[in-house]
């Protein structure tokens, strides 16, 4: 018995060695290998079919486990409802019956799925292991077949032939071929059949699952409707004990808590070195959300970042500063910007700068009302200007043309005239005093002259005439007129010297100046009437301010300045020696206005009319107002404007009322209008809530 087992074991070992040797030779290419490509395709399909069936079995088992879990959960839910149900409530037994029937339905559904689908699937997959083993055995028999064939071929091709060995090798070859063909034929028939039967199996399985599930849901729906009717009747019996939850979802749809996302605040550094750190804002995201294009269904413009809280104009300066515990020192420029000074561009803005820039307070003396002005215009209307020399001088009217320009000398003329009017009134009632009140004005005047690039020495005689007190205004007028009559030659020489100096005074204007001097001689007997007309004639020309941008305009400004100091000097000059008076008159000649005094109001009105006409020509047709962009806006369509923060847009009437009602405006950027003057090409839509209006 032991010998038999030993022989079988040795035989198996010998087979394995032969197979290993044959595979090595085949891998090395020293022995050919029998291949069946069609059978290999069958094997690949079999492996795929087995993987699909295994996955289907796994998912079906998970589905059945979920059904079992639902059965237990439903049973526990009905049990809890039955426990809380009071005995006197309607439908107590019905609730218990519904729970029991639901449990029976779940159990029946689970069992039918197990019997009709899972067991069938297990049977379907049960045939794969046997076929898989037969495929592996066939591959081994194929190696034995190749080995026997190679051994027979080697004996037949050898020079020394042994018939006994050849005949034995032929028998082994025929035996290996027979065994291989048995496995091969069976698998060649079975594998394609198994691959084709998978379709019918899938159909039967899922038809069974779907029918069972439909039947289950139909039956359990009846029970759920029964429970719903019981609960409805119970609610009707206890209608006075209704319980409502605020914010609970209604039958109309799910509960939607609408919460508008608050856009991030704009980052800003500390307002000042002494400001506390708790005033800083958290870093923000770069830009607001992309707005919907107005060319599509415009339901409204995009929502910009949260607007900043800006104080109203009625707030006083001390109230604004007290909001930040007196740690904020407002940066207010109290000097007029000169022509050579270029304002620094702020790289960063603080929250306080953004909030309070439009309402920067102006330095005012005690007892006087605070006057504020917007930095967009930097000027006040002429009828609101104050004559106090302690106030900071407002910006010149040249800023009305849209560009920042230096202070014009007409401000000096205005305050000098008004101060001289006051001095004329005081000279008749009080003795002369020290001219200390005019010292601040004298300090401002050289700065103005430096800004305009003019010779301040031409204005010094006027200032001296202003601050020298006189006892009698009539005597001063007579002295100046007599001096003017005594020095006609010097006056002519002064006028000739003014013309070649390049100050913009023509010979025709010089002739007009001579007529003015003659008119002044005839006006000497009417000194009192002149005093009465001076206040009316001085204020209006001082409002007409021309921008000083080149030398020619500076010359014209000199003439405008001289129109008022001439009358002022005649009214306020003190009596003195005759030899000094002509010299003073001669020094004043280059800055005198060659035009007669009565024509000054007419000239001012004409200049105002020309300025208004020029301003109207610079605006597009149908101009409404200006706005400033607060946030960047990128155009989504061709009919929209791409705006950057700080851009100024000229708003014109909208072609579509729907866009305007939805919050969209139509306009053209001021820079494009000034450069191209083409409204049709460069106008476009932009959201109104991305901008603020400039008054």
UniProtKB/Swiss-Prot annotation:
<feature type="region of interest" description="Disordered">
    <location>
        <begin position="244"/>
        <end position="312"/>
    </location>
</feature>
<protein>
    <recommendedName>
        <fullName>Amphiphysin</fullName>
    </recommendedName>
</protein>
<feature type="domain" description="SH3">
    <location>
        <begin position="622"/>
        <end position="695"/>
    </location>
</feature>
<keyword id="KW-0963">Cytoplasm</keyword>
<dbReference type="InterPro" id="IPR036028">
    <property type="entry name" value="SH3-like_dom_sf"/>
</dbReference>
<dbReference type="GO" id="GO:0005829">
    <property type="term" value="C:cytosol"/>
</dbReference>
<feature type="modified residue" description="Phosphoserine">
    <location>
        <position position="638"/>
    </location>
</feature>
<dbReference type="GO" id="GO:0006897">
    <property type="term" value="P:endocytosis"/>
</dbReference>
<feature type="modified residue" description="Phosphothreonine">
    <location>
        <position position="260"/>
    </location>
</feature>
<keyword id="KW-0728">SH3 domain</keyword>
<feature type="modified residue" description="Phosphothreonine">
    <location>
        <position position="280"/>
    </location>
</feature>
<keyword id="KW-0472">Membrane</keyword>
<dbReference type="GO" id="GO:0005886">
    <property type="term" value="C:plasma membrane"/>
</dbReference>
<keyword id="KW-0175">Coiled coil</keyword>
<feature type="compositionally biased region" description="Pro residues">
    <location>
        <begin position="261"/>
        <end position="274"/>
    </location>
</feature>
<keyword id="KW-0206">Cytoskeleton</keyword>
<dbReference type="GO" id="GO:0015629">
    <property type="term" value="C:actin cytoskeleton"/>
</dbReference>
<dbReference type="InterPro" id="IPR003005">
    <property type="entry name" value="Amphiphysin"/>
</dbReference>
<dbReference type="InterPro" id="IPR035470">
    <property type="entry name" value="Amphiphysin_I_SH3"/>
</dbReference>
<dbReference type="GO" id="GO:0007268">
    <property type="term" value="P:chemical synaptic transmission"/>
</dbReference>
<dbReference type="InterPro" id="IPR027267">
    <property type="entry name" value="AH/BAR_dom_sf"/>
</dbReference>
<comment type="function">
    <text>May participate in mechanisms of regulated exocytosis in synapses and certain endocrine cell types. May control the properties of the membrane associated cytoskeleton.</text>
</comment>
<dbReference type="GO" id="GO:0005543">
    <property type="term" value="F:phospholipid binding"/>
</dbReference>
<feature type="region of interest" description="Disordered">
    <location>
        <begin position="486"/>
        <end position="617"/>
    </location>
</feature>
<dbReference type="GO" id="GO:0048488">
    <property type="term" value="P:synaptic vesicle endocytosis"/>
</dbReference>
<keyword id="KW-0597">Phosphoprotein</keyword>
<dbReference type="GO" id="GO:0008021">
    <property type="term" value="C:synaptic vesicle"/>
</dbReference>
<keyword id="KW-0770">Synapse</keyword>
<dbReference type="InterPro" id="IPR004148">
    <property type="entry name" value="BAR_dom"/>
</dbReference>
<feature type="modified residue" description="Phosphoserine">
    <location>
        <position position="272"/>
    </location>
</feature>
<keyword id="KW-0968">Cytoplasmic vesicle</keyword>
<dbReference type="Pfam" id="PF03114">
    <property type="entry name" value="BAR"/>
</dbReference>
<dbReference type="InterPro" id="IPR003017">
    <property type="entry name" value="Amphiphysin_1"/>
</dbReference>
<feature type="modified residue" description="Phosphoserine">
    <location>
        <position position="262"/>
    </location>
</feature>
<feature type="modified residue" description="Phosphoserine">
    <location>
        <position position="506"/>
    </location>
</feature>
<comment type="subunit">
    <text>Heterodimer with BIN1. Binds SH3GLB1. Interacts with REPS1 and SGIP1. Binds AP2A2. Interacts with AP2B1. Interacts with DNM1 and SYNJ1.</text>
</comment>
<dbReference type="InterPro" id="IPR001452">
    <property type="entry name" value="SH3_domain"/>
</dbReference>
<feature type="modified residue" description="Phosphoserine">
    <location>
        <position position="276"/>
    </location>
</feature>
<feature type="modified residue" description="Phosphoserine">
    <location>
        <position position="268"/>
    </location>
</feature>
<dbReference type="GO" id="GO:0031256">
    <property type="term" value="C:leading edge membrane"/>
</dbReference>
<feature type="modified residue" description="Phosphoserine">
    <location>
        <position position="252"/>
    </location>
</feature>
<feature type="domain" description="BAR">
    <location>
        <begin position="24"/>
        <end position="240"/>
    </location>
</feature>
């Amino acid at each position: 018995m032991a010998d038999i087992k030993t022989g079988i074991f040795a035989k198996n070992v010998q087979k394995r060695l032969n197979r290993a040797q044959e595979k090595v030779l085949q891998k090395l290419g020293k022995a050919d290998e029998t291949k069946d490509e069609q059978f290999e395709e069958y094997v690949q399909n079999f492996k795929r079919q087995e993987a699909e069936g295994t996955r289907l079995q796994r998912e079906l088992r998970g589905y059945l486990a979920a059904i079992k879990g639902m059965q237990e959960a439903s049973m526990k839910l009905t049990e809890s409802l039955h426990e809380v149900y009071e005995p006197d409530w309607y439908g107590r037994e019905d609730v218990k019956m519904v729970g029991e029937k639901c449990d029976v339905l779940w159990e029946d559904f689970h069992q039918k799925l197990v019997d009709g689908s899972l067991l069938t699937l297990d049977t379907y997959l049960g045939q794969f292991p046997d076929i898989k083993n037969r495929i592996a055995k066939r591959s081994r028999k194929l190696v034995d077949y190749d080995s026997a064939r190679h051994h027979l071929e080697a004996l037949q091709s050898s020079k020394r032939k042994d018939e006994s060995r050849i005949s034995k090798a032929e028998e082994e070859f025929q035996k290996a071929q027979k065994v291989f063909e048995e496995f091969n034929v069976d698998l060649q028939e079975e594998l394609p059949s198994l691959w084709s039967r998978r379709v019918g199996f899938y159909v039967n399985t899922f038809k069974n699952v779907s029918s069972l599930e439909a039947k289950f849901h139909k039956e359990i729906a009846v029970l759920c409707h029964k429970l719903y009717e019981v609960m409805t009747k119970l609610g009707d019996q206890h209608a006075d004990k209704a319980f409502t939850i605020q914010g609970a979802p209604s039958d109309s749809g799910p509960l939607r808590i609408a919460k508008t996302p608050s856009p991030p605040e704009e980052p800003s550094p500390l307002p000042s070195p002494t400001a506390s750190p708790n005033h800083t804002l958290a870093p923000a995201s770069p830009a607001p959300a992309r707005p919907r294009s107005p060319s599509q269904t415009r339901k409204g413009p995009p929502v910009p970042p949260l607007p900043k809280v800006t104080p109203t104009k009625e707030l006083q300066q001390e109230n604004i500063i007290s909001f930040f515990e007196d740690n904020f020192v407002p940066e207010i420029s109290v000097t007029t910007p000169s022509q050579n000074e270029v304002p620094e561009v702020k790289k960063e803005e603080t929250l306080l700068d953004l909030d309070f820039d439009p309402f920067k307070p102006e330095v005012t003396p005690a007892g006087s009302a605070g006057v504020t002005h917007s930095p967009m215009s930097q000027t006040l209307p002429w009828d609101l200007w104050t004559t106090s020399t302690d106030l900071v001088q407002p910006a010149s009217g040249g800023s009305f043309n849209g560009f920042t320009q230096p202070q014009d000398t007409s401000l000096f003329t205005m305050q000098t005239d008004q101060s001289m009017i006051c001095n004329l009134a005081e000279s008749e009632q009080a003795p002369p005093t020290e001219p200390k009140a005019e010292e601040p004005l004298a300090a401002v005047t050289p700065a103005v002259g430096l800004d305009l690039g003019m010779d301040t020495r031409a204005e010094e005689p006027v200032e001296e005439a202003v601050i020298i007190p006189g006892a009698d205004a009539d005597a001063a007028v007579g002295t100046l007129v007599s001096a003017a009559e005594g020095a006609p030659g010097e006056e002519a020489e002064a006028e000739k010297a003014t013309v070649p100096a390049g100050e913009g005074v023509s010979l025709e204007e010089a002739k007009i100046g001579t007529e003015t001097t003659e008119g002044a001689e005839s006006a000497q007997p009417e000194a009192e009437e002149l005093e009465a007309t001076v206040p009316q004639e001085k204020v209006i020309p001082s409002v007409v301010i021309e921008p000083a941008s080149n030398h020619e305009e500076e010359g014209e400004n000199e003439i405008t300045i001289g129109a008022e100091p001439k009358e002022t000097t005649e009214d306020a000059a003190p009596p003195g020696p005759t030899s000094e008076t002509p010299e003073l008159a001669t020094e004043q000649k280059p800055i005198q206005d060659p035009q007669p005094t009565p024509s000054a109001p007419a000239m001012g009105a004409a200049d105002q009319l020309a300025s208004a006409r020029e301003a109207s020509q610079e605006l597009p047709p149908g101009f409404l107002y200006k706005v400033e962009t607060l946030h960047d806006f990128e155009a989504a369509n061709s009919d929209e404007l791409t705006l950057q923060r700080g851009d100024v847009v000229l708003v014109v009437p909208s072609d579509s009322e729907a866009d305007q009602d939805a919050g969209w405006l139509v306009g053209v950027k001021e820079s494009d209008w000034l450069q191209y003057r083409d409204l049709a090409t460069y106008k476009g839509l932009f959201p109104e809530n991305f901008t603020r209006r400039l008054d």
